[in-house]
Regions:
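PP2C/PPM-type serine/threonine phosphatase catalytic domain
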Residues: 1-264
Length: 264
C-alpha cells in the first residue's frame, strides 16, 4: 500500500500600490501575515512549508467606499479561520466540503457588510482568490475577478471562474472590443435577493506544480503566457518581482498583488 506523498510548499508574495492609486487596497493572508498597516509595498517568502496550508489575496473594490478596509477585514478573518477550515476539510466528503466553503464565503461576506454598516457606508466590497492545500489536493475558492493560475510543464491555465461582467463596445478606430464591467458577485454584497454561486475547484497535486494568485492589477497589463514564461524561467521571488516590474512599466494603473506557490 502506497503512503501519502510528502509534499512541501514554497511560497512568495509581492504587493504594490502601483503607479496611479493613492493607497494599496489589495490585501492577503500569507502565513501569519496580512497587510494590517496597508503598506505601499510588501515582499515576503515562506519556504519548506509542511501541509496543510492556505493562502489568499483580496482586491478591495476601488469603485466602492472603504475598499482597503473591506480587503483588510476579509484578510484578517481568513487568516484567523483558515486552520480550522483545513482541519474540517480533512476526511470531509464532497458535500461537506462544499458546505465548508459556502459557510466560509458567507461568513467573510457578513464580516465585510458588518464593517461597512458600522462605518455607515451602504456598500463596500472585495474580491477573494484562495488556495487550500491538503496532503494531496489543492482547493481553489474565489469570488470576484482575482485570478488563480496553474502552471504545469510550461503550460498555464486559469483554474477559477471569474465573476466579472464584460461589455462589448464598437470603436470606430479599433472595431468591436470587449471591456471589463463590474463584478457579478463580491464579498460585501447584499445576499438577501441573490446568493453566491460558489466557484470551487479541486486539483490533485503533483510535484513541480506552480500556482499563481493575482489581482487584476497584474492581468490588466501582463498576458497569461508571459506569466507562465516568467515563473518557469525565474525562481520564486525573482519571478514575482519581474512580473510586478512588467505591470508597472506598462502603466501600473491599479494595485498589484502576486502570490506564487510551488509544490516541492
Amino acid at each position: 500500500m502506497f503512503g501519502l506523498k510528502k509534499y512541501k510548499l514554497n511560497a512568495g508574495l509581492i504587493s504594490d500600490i502601483g503607479n496611479k492609486r493613492l493607497e494599496n487596497q489589495d490585501n492577503f493572508s500569507f502565513g501569519k501575515l496580512v497587510n494590517a498597516d496597508r503598506q505601499e509595498h510588501v515582499e515576503q517568502e515562506l519556504r519548506g512549508q509542511k501541509l496543510p496550508q492556505a493562502y489568499a489575496i483580496m482586491d478591495g473594490m476601488g469603485g466602492e467606499k472603504l475598499g482597503a478596509q473591506a480587503s483588510l477585514e476579509a484578510a484578517g478573518f481568513f487568516s484567523s479561520i483558515h486552520k480550522d477550515i483545513l482541519t474540517e476539510l480533512d476526511n470531509a466528503d464532497q458535500k461537506r466540503k462544499e458546505e465548508i466553503f459556502e459557510d466560509l464565503i458567507y461568513s467573510l461576506n457578513e464580516r465585510v457588510r458588518k464593517m461597512a454598516s458600522e462605518q455607515k457606508v451602504r456598500l463596500s466590497g472585495t474580491t477573494l482568490a484562495s488556495l487550500f492545500f491538503t496532503e494531496e489536493k489543492a482547493y481553489v475558492l474565489s469570488v470576484g475577478d482575482s485570478e488563480v493560475f496553474l502552471v504545469k510543464s510550461g503550460n498555464i491555465d486559469r483554474i477559477n471562474k471569474l465573476d466579472a461582467l464584460t461589455i462589448t463596445v464598437d470603436d470606430e478606430n479599433l472595431g468591436k472590443r470587449t471591456v471589463k464591467g463590474g463584478l457579478s458577485q463580491f464579498l460585501g454584497m447584499d445576499t438577501s435577493e441573490y446568493g453566491f454561486h460558489l466557484n470551487i475547484k479541486e486539483i490533485e497535486l503533483e510535484k513541480d506544480d506552480i500556482f499563481v494568485l493575482c489581482s487584476d492589477g497584474l492581468t490588466d497589463h501582463v498576458e497569461d503566457v508571459e506569466i507562465a514564461l516568467k515563473v518557469c524561467e525565474y525562481g520564486l521571488m525573482d519571478s514575482v518581482r519581474i512580473l510586478l516590474d512588467l505591470a508597472l512599466e506598462r502603466g501600473g494603473k491599479d494595485n498589484i498583488t502576486i502570490l506564487r506557490v510551488d509544490v516541492d
